[in-house]
Structure formats: structure tokens, C-alpha cells
Amino acid sequence: MKGKLIVLEGIDGSGKSSIGMMLTDILNNIGIKSIYTFEPTHAYYGSKLRESMLSKDLTPEEELSLFIADRKEHIKHMIRPAINDGYVIVLDRYMHSSIAYQGAKGIDKEYIYNLHKDFILEPDLVFILHLNIETALNRIMEKRGFVDRFENKHYLEEVDKIFSSFNEPYMHHIDASKDQKSICDEILNTIKESKILPLDSLQ
């Protein structure tokens, strides 16, 4: 069986990482080989991005270029080979984050999408987690003690508005204020209904 690409999106603090790892563990435990991964990566371009989030020395256009370069490498060297080997990829952030985050900084959203056309792998399912902005910021502060420059209330409100506008049939909007198990169960039920994976063993 060829693998699948399942994407988790949403603002920082919405719980994507925890849900992604939980989902990956459940799939592996029922015999569906799965890998959790994330963007930006810790490879060259992703590391440059992580540095810039603290130093504030890149323009939105420069940030976008690094995100796309990192994503190209991620797809080429990790995501595509794993999918071809039959793995389910559970991906924390993808091109939709670039559209939302850089779009909220004024870069045309269609332009951002078009920059991906030549290399992107279309996801099988996208789950967009929505959470009250103040709750998300409080979670971030509790977890690491600071917020980076992508993480202020007004900006994240604009980002979430763009996330809320995504309405392709394979995209599903999730209330991330619920407990993690409830969120994961909702995602698993949607995967089961979509029939992209054999989840009949799940009750």
C-alpha cells in the first residue's frame, strides 16, 4: 500500500505536536506504519528559520523563501520516500501554514500557493486546529516561558482567520479546546470515514 499524508495545521499553542505524536502512536500500535514529522525542520533551511524567529532579521519574503526551501528538502529527502515505502506521514505544518502566516503579513495568498505548485505533494487529509488566541498564548508561555515574533494576539487572529477560510473537501476544522483524547478520537473517526486507511480495528 502506498503511504498517505495527513497534515495538522493551526496556530502555535493549538496542540498540533501533542496530537500528532498521539495519532502516530495509535496508528503504529494497530499495525499501520507511521512517522511523525514537522516543519520547519532541523535541517539547514529550517534551522535558519528557527534562528530568525528570535532574531527578527528577515523580511516576510525572506521568511517565505526559507520555508519553501525547507519544505522542498523535506519532501524530497523524507516525506516522498517514506510515502513511497508505504508509511503514513503525520505532518505538523505544511504549505497551509505558509499561506496563513506569511499571508497575514501581506504576501498574496495565491502567490504563495503558486510557489508550491512544482514540488508539493497534495495531502490526503488536513486537520486545522482552532483555539482561542489568549489560551494558545498562555499555553506557549507555560511550555517554554517566552513567545517568538510570530506569536502576538493581533497577528495570530489574522492567521487564524486565514486558516478558517480553508474549505477544500479534504480539510477538516477541529475545536482544539477539547481534551487531547477527544481531539484525537475525532481525527481518527474522520480518517475512518474517509477510508484512506484500514481503521476497522478501532472501536
From Swiss-Prot:
InterPro entries: P-loop_NTPase, Thymidylate_kin-like_dom, Thymidylate_kin_CS, Thymidylate_kinase. It holds the Pfam family Thymidylate_kin. It comes from the Bacteria. ATP binds at residues 10-17. One of its GO terms (molecular function) is ATP binding. Phosphorylation of dTMP to form dTDP in both de novo and salvage pathways of dTTP synthesis. This is Thymidylate kinase. It comes from Brachyspira hyodysenteriae (strain ATCC 49526 / WA1).
